[in-house]
Amino acid sequence: LYRLLNPKKCSLKHTLVHRHALIDALLARSTCRQVVEIAAGFSPRGCMVSADQAYRYFEVDLPEVIALKRKRLEESVAGRVVLSRENFKLLVGDITTLDFLLHFPKAPTFVITEGIMMYFKRDAQLAIWRNIAQFLRVHGGEYVFDYIPLEDEPPRSLPGQLLSDLRQRLVKPPPP
């Protein structure tokens, strides 16, 4: 039963690849042509999407991350091509203040925070979400994120609750 609930083929790598692909699909369906990826890290999404000149792509991260990504992109011909695009920008910004959001052109914007929100305490998450909501009220657009705090999950159905309880019992470590 454990293998049924946790198949080995469902690794963290597969989960991350599927999450990334889902966000890519949502972006492809969106009418927004301005994208702001907050805490982009080494995501290749901006490099790929900005190949289409119809998009303006802004990657935002901490200074050290932006410097390292720029350095890595400068090391290859393909990376230098990406950096030379007018519609691709690497920007320094702090997700906890979101002051950088004030400087984007006013256009419907697709905002992404992938793989970052889980690292913040509840109060910080709410502040970030309020800032992004305010930005989208002015610019219009969509917000995609991959994290729902447990206290905000909808209640499970009875079968879902039973499966969850059973799963927790199965994966519970044995007593010492």
Task: Describe the role of every protein-language-model region.
Residues 1-176:
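Alpha-helical subdomain
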